[in-house]
Amino acid sequence: MKTEHILVIRFSAMGDVAMTVPVVYSLAKQYPHVRITVLSRPFARPFFENLSPNVGFMEADLKGEYKGVKGLNALYRRLIAKQFTAIADLHSVLRSSYLRMRFNLDNFNVAHIDKHRKGKRMLVASTNKKLVKQPSSFQNYADVFEQLGYPVKLDFQSMFGEGKGDLSTLPQEVFQAEEGNLISLDDNNLEAPWIGIAPFAAHAGKIYPQPLMEKVIQQLISHYPHSHIFLFGGGQDETPVMDAWAEKFPQVVNASAKLHGISDELILMSHLRVMLSMDSGNMHLASLVNTPVVSIWGATHPYAGFMGWHQSPENAVQLDMPCRPCSIYGNKPCMRGDFACMKNISPEMV
């Protein structure tokens, strides 16, 4: 009899891929006899390679080797050689839909995600808005496996189980807040809490203004002068901002500039007292290691279903405005033109 082997497809983005982890973990533990292979972009490997003995990872470079229809056909030939018995499309975009179509034509057991687009459109409508909570992405992913014949009870605590990541594996410079001043590795000191801040996101509608975030940092340091604040994220434009904060405040370290990728970030995040983030991938990374997250929401809204795993709605900082939410992903221009949903959140609220 053929070994049960599920292919799980989710290519991007980082936060959405991270949200598959609690579901894939729960599936793997509840069906230990079933092999599970996650197909994603190379960045996602750290999420899955040590998740469970029956979970494997397969990377696909969709901008290189598997670009275009020719590339997808080559990828499909590689996939069918793996002898999958079920296909779970957790993405349902053009590329995954093409692969899904090929599997369907070859009579595979295939299911894909229901994104509840109608409900989300009503959530962000400019008129007749209906502020109705949509199913979470976690539930949407679990529903796909149920369609395939694998109902899942979501049961996940942390990528490190009941423990935390090993700090000794991290570069020592991340624990050097200023020249000659090493941070104590005692993350349980109530007087010197470890606090993470991920101040940026992919779109302007999800970013708390820099001057206000700097005031938040100042107030945290005022309340906890011995605290250690680790900054996460930042692309080419954002890194200089975080470097400037680290230069200005001795308690602040630009952690992402010193760590080596997602694996290191997850280890450090597991030791934080709290993470402050936008509606961004870092909210989901911290959630995967059982760290409480205070999240700031502007153009987007937790009701769209993208709240971090097991995060409390009470820790979502947001304003009640008739125009909110105006976007599911935060990528639409502000209809008011002033991003008041972010600018009017005071540092004291945070």
Task: Give the predicted meaning of each segment.
Residues 1-350:
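Catalytic machinery of carbohydrate-active enzymes
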